């Protein structure tokens, strides 16, 4: 029961974490491109 709950949380968090990393990397790329860093 606990393992299923933990695996569900992990499987739910992985796409959110990946999406957050992609968004932050994209925003940093856009910001760096605009500020010409």
Swiss-Prot record:
<protein>
    <recommendedName>
        <fullName>Cytochrome b6-f complex subunit 5</fullName>
    </recommendedName>
</protein>
<keyword id="KW-0602">Photosynthesis</keyword>
<keyword id="KW-0793">Thylakoid</keyword>
<keyword id="KW-0472">Membrane</keyword>
<keyword id="KW-0249">Electron transport</keyword>
<feature type="transmembrane region" description="Helical">
    <location>
        <begin position="5"/>
        <end position="25"/>
    </location>
</feature>
<dbReference type="InterPro" id="IPR036099">
    <property type="entry name" value="Cyt_6/f_cplx_su5_sf"/>
</dbReference>
<dbReference type="InterPro" id="IPR003683">
    <property type="entry name" value="Cyt_6/f_cplx_su5"/>
</dbReference>
<keyword id="KW-0813">Transport</keyword>
<dbReference type="GO" id="GO:0045158">
    <property type="term" value="F:electron transporter, transferring electrons within cytochrome b6/f complex of photosystem II activity"/>
</dbReference>
<keyword id="KW-0150">Chloroplast</keyword>
<comment type="subunit">
    <text>The 4 large subunits of the cytochrome b6-f complex are cytochrome b6, subunit IV (17 kDa polypeptide, PetD), cytochrome f and the Rieske protein, while the 4 small subunits are PetG, PetL, PetM and PetN. The complex functions as a dimer.</text>
</comment>
<keyword id="KW-0934">Plastid</keyword>
<dbReference type="Pfam" id="PF02529">
    <property type="entry name" value="PetG"/>
</dbReference>
<comment type="similarity">
    <text>Belongs to the PetG family.</text>
</comment>
<dbReference type="GO" id="GO:0017004">
    <property type="term" value="P:cytochrome complex assembly"/>
</dbReference>
<comment type="function">
    <text>Component of the cytochrome b6-f complex, which mediates electron transfer between photosystem II (PSII) and photosystem I (PSI), cyclic electron flow around PSI, and state transitions. PetG is required for either the stability or assembly of the cytochrome b6-f complex.</text>
</comment>
<keyword id="KW-1133">Transmembrane helix</keyword>
<dbReference type="GO" id="GO:0015979">
    <property type="term" value="P:photosynthesis"/>
</dbReference>
<dbReference type="GO" id="GO:0009535">
    <property type="term" value="C:chloroplast thylakoid membrane"/>
</dbReference>
<keyword id="KW-0812">Transmembrane</keyword>
<dbReference type="GO" id="GO:0009512">
    <property type="term" value="C:cytochrome b6f complex"/>
</dbReference>
């Amino acid at each position: 029961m606990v393992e299923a709950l933990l695996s569900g949380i992990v499987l739910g968090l992985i796409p959110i974490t990946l999406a957050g990393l992609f968004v932050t990397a994209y925003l940093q790329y856009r910001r760096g491109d605009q500020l010409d860093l």
